[in-house]
């Protein structure tokens, strides 16, 4: 496409830029970033999303087309795909805006797989992955006889605990795992709908039950709190505890009315919290429709994007199975449809789509960045952890 566009006469490109690729309300150029996306009004006229928001009534969302005065509502607008495709076709020949250059400069680099460990037998149908912030050890929960397996940072020296059984301290069906700042392992157990905390030697420290209907995703905050999603109740909880003493200090519901929330992640840079929802659409598989919501540290919604919105930007279907933040505050998701790892950009830029890994994965289900900026991906199809290194200078 870039070569074809390069052969287009400059005057035609300029004419297209002025006549077709510019919002005639604010005279800003259309783009793929959220505020500049071209939106079709029901009458056929096209304006940018920022102008739709500015023209719409704050409560009723009613607006009039600025050109023909036909009434409609903001929710009646849709992405103008011909303009988006034209932007893609002529992208390399258009004059890059400073904002676009800034966005490109902070995008993460390309990733290359340079190590893998685990494999069938060592791991069996793994579901969750975490890193110990102090030691760099890798913790995985899976369907083996002992549910929790701990590797050293290089993938060797594994030890395990968390017997499969019916006792209160056993782990029946682990869904996710996290490691606290003081090296305690936190597991969500769907078998008895509880949250279980172990020390690194496998001694049970705390069991939190009854508060959850189906605890799923778990993550640790910078202040050593525990974030837990409840997929059945549609909630996000924050737990604070004295882990060495095994005492639960308090539990707070941060969000309600979420739709089947599973994965959760927190940015240590900004304090933002990302929640991965699996909305159940009537007559469709819930696993094929996903949505990422990002809240700031005050739990105000600052960005969201769903499978439908992503599929307008990306040539193949995206089904998010896991979410995390990189060290720059970008939201990163695992895609099981690709399979791939995709950067969605910062929440205020949603969706600034950038594929990071498109080869070497079968079914990625969990992600975590190391302090050295390597990316660990849990691949449930190959029952292994794959380590990708950020190749600085290959991105952008």
Swiss-Prot record:
A zinc finger (RING-type) spans 23-69. It comes from the Eukaryota. Pfam families: zf-RING_5. Its main location: endoplasmic reticulum. GO terms for cellular component: cytosol; endoplasmic reticulum; nucleoplasm; nucleus; perinuclear region of cytoplasm. It catalyses: S-ubiquitinyl-[E2 ubiquitin-conjugating enzyme]-L-cysteine + [acceptor protein]-L-lysine = [E2 ubiquitin-conjugating enzyme]-L-cysteine + N(6)-ubiquitinyl-[acceptor protein]-L-lysine. Keywords: Autophagy, Endoplasmic reticulum, Metal-binding, Nucleus, Repeat, Transferase, Ubl conjugation pathway, Zinc, Zinc-finger. Its EC number is 2.3.2.27. The RING domain is essential for ubiquitin E3 ligase activity. This is E3 ubiquitin-protein ligase NHLRC1. It comes from Rattus norvegicus (Rat). The gene is Nhlrc1.
């Amino acid at each position: 496409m870039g070569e074809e566009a390069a052969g287009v006469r400059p005057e035609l490109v300029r004419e297209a830029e002025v006549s077709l690729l510019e919002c005639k309300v604010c005279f800003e150029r259309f783009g793929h970033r959220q505020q500049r996306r071209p939106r079709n009004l029901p009458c056929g006229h096209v304006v940018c999303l920022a102008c739709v928001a500015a023209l719409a009534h704050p409560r009723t969302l009613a607006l009039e087309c600025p050109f023909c005065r036909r009434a409609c509502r903001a929710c009646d607008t849709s992405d103008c795909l011909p303009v988006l495709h034209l932007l893609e076709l002529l992208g390399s020949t258009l004059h890059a805006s400073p904002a676009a250059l800034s966005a490109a400069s902070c995008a993460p680099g390309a990733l290359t797989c340079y190590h893998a460990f685990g494999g069938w037998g060592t791991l069996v149908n793994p579901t969750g992955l975490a890193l110990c912030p102090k030691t760099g050890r890798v913790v995985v929960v899976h369907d083996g006889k002992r549910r929790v397996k701990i590797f050293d940072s290089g993938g060797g020296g594994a030890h395990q605990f968390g017997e499969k059984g019916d006792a209160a301290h056993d782990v029946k069906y682990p869904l996710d795992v996290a490691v606290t700042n003081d090296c305690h392992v936190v597991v969500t157990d769907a078998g008895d709908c509880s949250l279980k905390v172990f020390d690194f030697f496998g001694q049970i420290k705390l069991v939190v039950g009854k508060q959850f209907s189906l605890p799923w995703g778990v993550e640790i905050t910078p202040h050593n709190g525990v974030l837990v999603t409840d997929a059945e109740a549609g909630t996000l909880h924050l737990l604070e505890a004295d882990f060495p003493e095994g005492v639960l200090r308090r539990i707070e519901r941060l969000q309600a009315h979420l739709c089947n929330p599973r994965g959760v992640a927190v940015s240590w840079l900004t304090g933002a919290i990302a929640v991965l929802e699996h909305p159940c659409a009537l007559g469709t598989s819930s696993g094929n429709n996903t949505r990422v919501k990002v809240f700031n540290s005050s739990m105000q919604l600052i960005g969201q994007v769903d499978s439908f919105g992503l599929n307008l930007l990306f040539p193949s279907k995206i089904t998010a199975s896991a979410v995390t933040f990189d060290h720059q505050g970008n939201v990163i998701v695992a895609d099981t449809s690709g399979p791939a790892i995709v950067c969605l950009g910062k929440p205020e830029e949603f969706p600034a789509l950038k594929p990071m890994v498109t080869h070497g994965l079968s079914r990625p289900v969990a992600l975590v960045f190391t302090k050295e900026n390597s990316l660990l991906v849990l691949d449930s199809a190959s029952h292994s952890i794959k380590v990708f290194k950020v190749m600085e200078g290959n991105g952008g």
